[in-house]
A protein has these predicted regions:
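Compact nucleic-acid interaction/catalytic patches
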Residues: 21-23, 29-64
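C-terminal terminal-subdomain/extension
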Residues: 1, 64-111
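Short, charged beta-turn/beta-strand-edge "cap" motif at the junction between a beta-strand
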Residues: 14-18
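Short secondary-structure transition/capping segments
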Residues: 28-33, 89-93
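Short, surface-exposed helix-loop/turn micro-motifs enriched in polar/charged residues
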Residues: 1, 19-21
Length: 111
């Protein structure tokens, strides 16, 4: 399966430790397309349907689309590098504007 930045995929986050996100849930890929084509891992951010308002830059709301059936928050402070084996399927994609906003919020989390 070809994986690109901005793709929303279903990922198995088990096993979890401490306050990490768990479950099989959607996540958005943020690693670059070149890396995604040669590495066996991807960098991604999990999504949650447990919506919390006014939490930027830690969360970013996106609307349902394609096979993402519910509005969701991207959990920007829960960045992960995981094996592609954990990815079950692609279900949607962020728009370019959403992806750019996501990266801006991620940068705020890292400073």
């Amino acid at each position: 399966m070809e994986l690109n930045r901005g793709d929303i995929v279903i990922v198995n986050f088990y096993p979890k430790k401490g306050d990490e996100v768990a479950k099989i849930r959607p996540a958005v890929i943020i690693s670059g397309n070149d890396e995604n084509s040669i590495l066996d891992t991807v960098i991604l951010l999990p999504l949650s349907t447990d919506l919390i308002d006014d939490m930027q830059p830690y969360r970013m709301r996106i609307k349902s689309r394609d096979n993402l059936k519910q509005d969701s928050d991207i959990l920007i402070n829960q960045i992960r590098t995981l094996s592609k084996v954990r990815i079950k399927e692609k279900i949607a994609k962020l728009t370019d504007n959403e992806y750019n906003e996501l990266i801006e919020n991620l940068c705020k989390n890292l400073h």
